[in-house]
Design a protein with these regions (language model features):
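Conserved catalytic or metal-liganding residues and their short signature motifs at active sites
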Residues: 1-239, 244-246, 281-286, 290-298, ...
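Conserved SxxK-family serine transpeptidase/carboxypeptidase catalytic domain
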Residues: 239-281, 286
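Short glycine/proline-rich, acidic loop/turn segments that cap or connect secondary-structure elements
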Residues: 259-265, 290-301
Length: 339
């Protein structure tokens, strides 16, 4: 009888152990199927975090991860940040990562930005900072002065590219880190090239922003840059249409008429000699280099080609330029482009 009771007891223990193993195993053996970032927001509730985990990791894997967080009494909802759950991680290890793991870097990629307001909005959509908090700094003269900039030139620090930040980075630290990358770009060789042109890095960026708006053709940017450098050297007004459009603020314009050239603005290079107070867009590194390495030529006039290829006709004389301009205007009229 005792032997029978012992066998039954051992069987129950064995069955219980197997059942426990079958229950526990998925928490250690199931694997996350792809790299996934979990974002934990300030003041996030436990329920909200559970919902986010299930949404990003999948219902089943997410439930198991949330269960392990409860078992571990992790209180991960208090750990504001972005945490990478790598491909192949189990629910248990995913929970431990959310409990103790360090933040992962978040990619911030930007290009084709014109205004500081647009830039601040892009940043706020990717990183955990309010648009207005960053914008307030970038429009503050004292803050800009710390970097040797003004609110008109502060955009030169932010060069379109791919960067990595902690999601929780503060606005001041964000600008500091971007300034670090800016200084890496402006090495001794580039500074020497700018000096040889008689320009500061800010002036190079300002000229490059005009060049970038003048032509989308990267292989033409150096040639356009040299044309403007020739004008600066001979003390001619730049007379760059993009500066007039920037002053007007209407980017739907395709034709610049004589009355628009009278727009009262320090950015209007038809009215004022030299470069405007700052860039008219955030400038690509390749365009900065196009200015610094602009090939020599004697052109001082240019006009869009009448075939609408995006390239320009260049001229050394005003009469040649007028002939180029007439052909282009004739084609505008033929196509019915009035503004």
């Amino acid at each position: 009888m005792k032997r029978r009771i012992l066998i039954i007891s051992l069987s129950i223990v064995a069955i219980a152990s197997i059942a426990a193993a079958l229950f526990i195993a998925p928490f250690f053996l199931n694997k996350n199927e792809k790299d996934t970032i979990i974002y934990i927001y300030p003041d996030m509730t436990e329920v909200a975090l559970e919902d986010s985990i299930k949404a990003r990791l999948g219902e089943d894997f997410g439930k198991k991860t949330s269960f392990m967080l409860k078992v571990l009494d992790a209180k991960a909802y208090n750990r504001t940040g972005a945490y990478l759950i790598p491909n192949g991680l189990s629910p248990y290890k995913a929970a431990r990562k959310l409990q103790y793991g360090g933040q992962t870097g978040v990619k911030f990629i930007f290009n084709n930005v014109r205004f500081v307001d647009n830039f601040a909005e892009r940043v706020s959509k990717r990183l955990l900072m309010e648009k207005d908090d960053l914008l307030t700094l970038l429009k503050d003269s004292a803050f800009c002065a710390k970097y040797g900039k003004t609110p008109q030139t502060i955009s030169t620090i932010f060069q379109p590219d791919s960067y990595e930040f902690y999601w929780t980075v503060k606005p001041e630290d964000f600008v500091d880190r971007m300034y670090h990358f800016y200084n890496k770009f402006w090495n001794e060789e580039r500074l020497a090239k700018a000096k040889a042109l008689g320009l500061t890095p800010d002036e190079v960026a300002t000229l490059a922003s005009i060049v970038e708006d003048e032509t989308a053709k990267r292989d033409e940017r150096g040639k356009v840059a040299r044309l403007y450098l020739n004008r600066i050297k001979t003390r001619m007004k730049l007379q760059a249409d993009p500066t007039v459009i920037y002053a007007i603020g209407d980017y739907s314009i395709r034709r610049v008429y004589s009355y628009t050239l009278k727009t009262d603005s320090p950015y209007n290079t038809y009215l004022h000699f030299g470069l405007p107070p700052g860039p008219i867009r955030f400038v690509e590194k390749s365009t900065l280099d196009a200015v610094l390495n602009a090939p020599s030529h004697n052109y001082i006039y240019m006009c869009a080609k009448e075939n609408f290829s995006g390239y320009h006709n260049f001229a050394t004389s005003y009469s040649e330029h007028k002939a180029n301009a007439r052909r282009y205007q004739k084609e505008l009229n033929r196509r019915g482009i009035k503004r």
